[in-house]
Design a protein with these regions (language model features):
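Terminal peptide-recognition signature
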Residues: 6, 20, 44, 87, ...
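Vicinal oxygen chelate
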Residues: 10-14, 68-113
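Short loop/turn microsegments at loop-to-beta-strand junctions
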Residues: 4, 39-40, 105-107
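Short, flexible helix/strand-to-coil boundary loops that buttress conserved ligand/catalytic motifs
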Residues: 21, 55, 84
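Conserved short beta-strand elements that form part of the metal-binding/catalytic scaffold
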Residues: 31-65, 118-121
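Short solvent-exposed loop/turn micro-motifs enriched in small/polar/acidic residues
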Residues: 1, 35-37, 101-103
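N-terminal beta-strand motif that seeds the catalytic metal site of vicinal oxygen chelate
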Residues: 1-18, 27-32, 67-70, 93, ...
């Protein structure tokens, strides 16, 4: 296998790519746009892991059947905090605000404004 990646289909892909780049300090490594400026396919590098974003052209329920879980090392709590602060802007639902839980001293779970369910935490 050459690689695996996380792929999401959402409305507002161009805005989402910018938000996710800010949240994770992630460079755009591939981007193919549709005529309307949305992304047919975009890839950003989130600490060596690829997050792919494409425009959703059919209605769906993104965020309610799967979750992106990003597990950071103990010395990367600042990355968790930064991502949380960017991604909760306009969030649809915050399940667990940033704080301690049974498996992490620094965790948050929420659905962002694009309908993506995230769990981000550190050791």
């Amino acid at each position: 296998m050459k690689r695996t990646l996380m792929q999401v289909y959402i409305k507002g892909s161009a805005e989402a790519v910018g938000v996710y780049q800010r949240a994770f300090n992630a460079p755009l490594v591939a981007g193919y746009k549709n005529d309307d400026g949305t992304y047919m396919h975009a890839e950003i590098d989130v600490d060596g892991q690829i997050l792919a974003v494409s425009e959703e052209f059919q209605s769906g329920n993104a965020g309610n059947k799967m979750q992106f879980c990003l597990h950071y090392k103990n010395d990367e709590k600042d990355k968790v905090t930064k991502a949380y602060n960017v991604l909760i802007e306009g969030a649809q639902k915050i399940y667990d605000p940033l704080g301690p839980c049974s498996y992490s001293p620094h965790m948050a779970a929420f659905v962002d404004k694009f309908g993506i369910f995230w769990c981000i935490f550190s050791d």
